[in-house]
Amino acid sequence: TKVNALMPLSGKIIVIDPGHGGKDPGTTSDTTYEKDINLAISKALEIELSKVGATVILTRDGDYDLSEPNARWRKKSDFDNRINLINNSKANLYLSIHLNYLTNSAYYGPQVFYQEKSIDLATIIQKTLNNSLNSDREMKEIPKKTYMYDKLTIPGVLIECGFLSNAAEREKL
């Protein structure tokens, strides 16, 4: 098939999963919550991918999680619903958007985590992020037996977009 040069992702479906949401803020720094930045990055990414022809599905488009209202184990319910949404989406790939945090605030830069089946995708994304953001972080494999990622059936990666613990990077995020 010939790919349209202006719409190279035409016909492709991409799920973007903004991590956390609702009662789960993710990592925090003062009044800055990971969940909010994850959502903002995801919405911006949705716009950019749509411009080149992709059909984009967000797992959430507001400040909420995906757990059942009366779930006893909210986190597991949230994970299970994200897994089902992604697996049933008929997508070509997923991008899970998160932020990093370490007590040592010197660390900065984006880092891609991948499963073996997604190493090529991870390599492309990590190289692109490093070149664009003047970073030298290396991608890492997601540890085996990681609940959510073990259950996903389509290729994809987790992208830690930067460190909320680094003041300069937090301002950029």
Locate each region found by the language model.
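Active-site-proximal helix/loop segments of hydrolytic enzymes
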Residues: 4-6, 32, 36-173
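Non-catalytic propeptide/linker segments at domain boundaries
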Residues: 1-13
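Short glycine-rich His-centered loop
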Residues: 12-31
